[in-house]
Design a protein with these regions (language model features):
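N-terminal secretory/targeting leader peptides
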Residues: 1-185
Length: 185
């Protein structure tokens, strides 16, 4: 399987589990699929995927992935510029960023739900369940690569440990909340 995936740890983890990860920009995915240069692809979520036209070639959609479970908007500002801002301006940026994130997540949930419905009802796309063994295999491969990176880079190890500590706290709650929320529909 030749699969368009991001480079770095993500692509390396796919390679570890026997998937030939191919890195390419978004605009190259559909032509690569049409020419048979790749067999499958990931990009984002139903709405952007449908805008790119993947449904013209791909008819099986797997929503549940691991390497990117959320999409968040990013805002970058030069550190010197940020430092030159007043406390009020910094607070205004913080409030605007938080409001934007909240609105963005609500918007994405709605537009992606509508796009998934359109893909399945109007374009012959079949929504598939990701095989359970994918999750354990991918996570084992990713963990191996992350442990190797942590052994080579002290700062990476510190950040990764912080992320694991955070996950130990939030994952049990969030997984449980999402399971119960899913049962409402």
């Amino acid at each position: 399987l030749r699969f368009r995936a991001p480079p770095g740890v993500v692509g390396a983890a796919y390679n570890e589990i026997g998937v030939a990860a191919v890195a390419m920009g978004g605009g190259d995915i559909l032509p690569a699929l049409e020419k048979g240069a790749i067999d499958a692809a990931e990009w984002c979520c139903p709405q952007p995927d449908s805008v790119f036209g993947f449904q013209k070639v791909l008819k099986h959609y797997y929503l549940q992935g691991l390497h990117q479970v959320v999409v968040n908007a990013d805002f970058y500002l030069n550190g010197d510029v940020y430092d030159s801002l007043s406390a009020t301006e910094k607070k205004a940026l913080e409030v605007a960023a938080n409001a934007s994130l909240s609105k963005s997540q609500s918007y994405r949930i709605g537009t992606n739900g509508a796009a998934l419905k359109d893909l399945t009802e109007n374009h012959g796309v079949i929504l598939e369940d990701t095989p359970a063994d994918y999750f354990t295999e991918y996570m084992a491969a990713a963990k191996k690569l992350l442990e190797e990176a942590a052994a080579e880079n002290e700062f990476f190890a510190e950040v990764w440990q912080s992320q694991k500590d955070f996950a130990d706290i939030v994952v049990p709650f969030w997984a449980g909340a999402q399971t119960s929320n899913a049962s409402l529909g």
